[in-house]
Amino acid sequence: MNNILKRLSIYTREFKYNLKLAYPVMIGMLGHTFVQFIDNVMVGQLGTAELAAISLGNSFVFIAMSIGIGFSQAITPLIAEADGAKKDNDISRIFEHSFVICLTLGIVLFLSVFLNRNLLYSMNQPIEVVKLASPYLFWVSMSLLTIVTFQSFRQFADGLSFTRAAMYSTLVGNAINIILNYFLIFGYWIFP
């Protein structure tokens, strides 16, 4: 019995460290979803057609964003492995390559969503909703470039166990999104 408790105590010592690493990652991942949630809440105040339009646009962007984020997940274990082996040259090489790949993937995903926006018309949605969704889809699809490129930095930092930096930048990004939504959606100050 003592042997089992001893092994369990060795195992549980890592819980605190793992949670310290994991909670910023979880909050950061929720931050990506929170942007679309806030957009839905704020645009929903304009009307049902506007809400339907951004929901339709977000369905396209969510698929592309999931591909970009999923693709970038490979960076973290590669960086962590190189960091654990104290191979600084490998860390820089992995980061440089992952940045270029994520930037390229961001461009490809943006173009894929942007060039296929006419698919909105074949989704049996009211024409009013599609006309509202098309310009929204353009602006939101542009964010794919920054999201996927940001992921290369985020996964790099996560691989080095600096998980809080990405969490803080995601929280700041969400705050900026709320402020800009307020001005751009409702047309306050100098915005139409």
Where are these predicted regions, by residue range?
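Alpha-helical transmembrane segments of multi-pass membrane transporters/permeases
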Residues: 156-183
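Short alpha-helical transmembrane segments in multi-pass integral membrane proteins
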Residues: 1-22, 79-145, 176-179, 191-192
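Residue-level signal for short hydrophobic patches within transmembrane helices
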Residues: 15-34, 38, 60-67, 142, ...
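Small-residue-rich hydrophobic transmembrane alpha-helices
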Residues: 51-110, 114, 147-166
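Helix-loop interface residues and adjacent transmembrane-helix termini in multi-pass membrane transporters
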Residues: 34-37, 45-48, 82-85, 159-160, ...
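Transmembrane alpha-helix boundary and packing residues in multipass membrane permease domains
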Residues: 25, 29, 41, 77, ...
